[in-house]
């Protein structure tokens, strides 16, 4: 089907849905039609803008052919034609991006997990830096950042930490953060001034609701034990810590941050549900397009995606060859938008090559 025919078909569908909604339908039929109508609004607005520019260009070209035009009028028409010819490719691209298949998870809130990787205590300190960076970014975006669990080293580092980030389209903005983040800096304990390299792993999961993932009680094994602190000492005398295993997948979540077993269980179930949902989402994504696994958006957690070089004051994203020489703004202030927007644009460009 030609591009223009496809656009006409979408406009017809939008008009028919509008007529249907105004005809007095009720119940599930109304809900379904309303959802479809709302989903088409953005792309229809872009199609209309594109069609309007095409129509204006055709009119301008026809007017230019008329006999007896003075030089001033002719120059004005040629300027208009030049402007329209330059805007059409951009408008067409905007339409194609709006037509790209949507990831159902993009509109969801997210759970972020940061784990120290290679590099010992320095890696744990870097994991804490990353976790705080995402907290600052969430604050800048007006999202709600709720710490779910932190396993600290006792001297400021995090062995692992997780948080729930709630807001509009959180997952669509943060999903490209999944992967291995590397840091190069001189540790405070380094007397010779040598640069050390360490790493931390970030996983971003779409936060799943109960309607997304139904977990049967029979599929869970729940173990309780006494919470322990740094060095293994017990921090309370009740079995408040919880370990939940989803038997069909083998996915396990352990939590001991809260003094209440009930609260630990609720948080652990939230993380478990997100991990199961993400696993199912990844399988579907792989089935849809194996060829896209290697590109930005694959979220491969073994992939080294970004380096933070403190001596040089730079942050480099290796997937899109983008380097920013403002490490403090990025790390301390959470100013991640330049990376986020560039990664989204790169992902859209690669998807456009497939249609």
Curated annotation (Swiss-Prot):
Pfam families, per the entry: PCRF, RF-1
Entry annotated with the keyword Cytoplasm: yes
One term of GO molecular function: translation release factor activity, codon specific
List of residues that carry N5-methylglutamine: 233
UniProt KW keywords: Cytoplasm, Methylation, Protein biosynthesis
Domain of life of the native organism: Bacteria
Biased composition (Basic and acidic residues): 280-293
Post-translational modification remark: Methylated by PrmC. Methylation increases the termination efficiency of RF1.
Region entry Disordered, spans: 280-308
Official protein name in the record: Peptide chain release factor 1
Source organism of this protein record: Rickettsia conorii (strain ATCC VR-613 / Malish 7)
Lineage, top ranks: Bacteria, Pseudomonadati, Pseudomonadota, Alphaproteobacteria, Rickettsiales
Gene that produces this protein: prfA
């Amino acid at each position: 089907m030609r591009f223009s025919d496809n656009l006409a078909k979408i406009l017809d569908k939008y008009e028919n849905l509008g007529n249907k909604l105004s005809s007095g339908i009720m119940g599930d039929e109304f809900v379904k039609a309303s959802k479809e109508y709302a989903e088409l609004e953005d792309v229809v607005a872009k199609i209309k803008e594109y069609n309007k520019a095409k129509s204006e260009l055709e009119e301008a070209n026809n007017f230019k052919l008329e006999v007896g035009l003075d030089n001033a009028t002719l120059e004005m028409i040629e300027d208009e034609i030049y402007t329209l010819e330059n805007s059409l490719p951009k408008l067409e691209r905007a339409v194609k991006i709006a037509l790209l298949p949507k990831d159902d998870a993009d509109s969801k809130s997210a759970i972020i997990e940061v784990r120290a990787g290679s590099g010992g205590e320095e890696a744990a300190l870097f994991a804490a830096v990353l976790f705080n960076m995402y907290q600052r970014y969430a604050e800048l975006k007006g999202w709600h950042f709720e710490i779910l669990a932190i396993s600290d080293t006792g001297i400021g580092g995090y062995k692992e930490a997780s948080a729930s980030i709630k807001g509009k389209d959180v997952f669509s903005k943060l999903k490209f953060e999944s992967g291995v983040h590397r840091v190069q800096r001189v540790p405070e304990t380094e007397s010779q001034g040598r640069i050390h390299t360490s790493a931390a792993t970030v996983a971003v999961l779409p936060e799943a609701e109960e309607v997304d993932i139904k977990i049967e009680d029979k599929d869970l094994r729940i173990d309780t034990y006494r919470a322990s602190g740094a060095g293994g000492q017990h921090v309370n005398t009740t079995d408040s810590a919880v370990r939940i295993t989803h038997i069909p997948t083998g996915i396990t979540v352990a939590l001991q941050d809260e003094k209440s077993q009930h609260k630990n269980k609720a948080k652990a179930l939230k993380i478990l549900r997100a991990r199961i949902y993400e696993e199912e989402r990844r399988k579907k994504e792989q089935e849809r397009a194996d060829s896209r696994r290697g590109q930005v958006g694959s979220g491969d957690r073994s992939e080294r995606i970004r380096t933070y070089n403190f001596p040089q004051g730079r942050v480099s994203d290796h997937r899109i060859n983008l380097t920013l020489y403002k490490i403090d703004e990025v790390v301390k202030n959470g100013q991640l938008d330049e990376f986020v927007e560039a990664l989204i644009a790169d992902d859209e460009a690669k998807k456009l090559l497939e249609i």
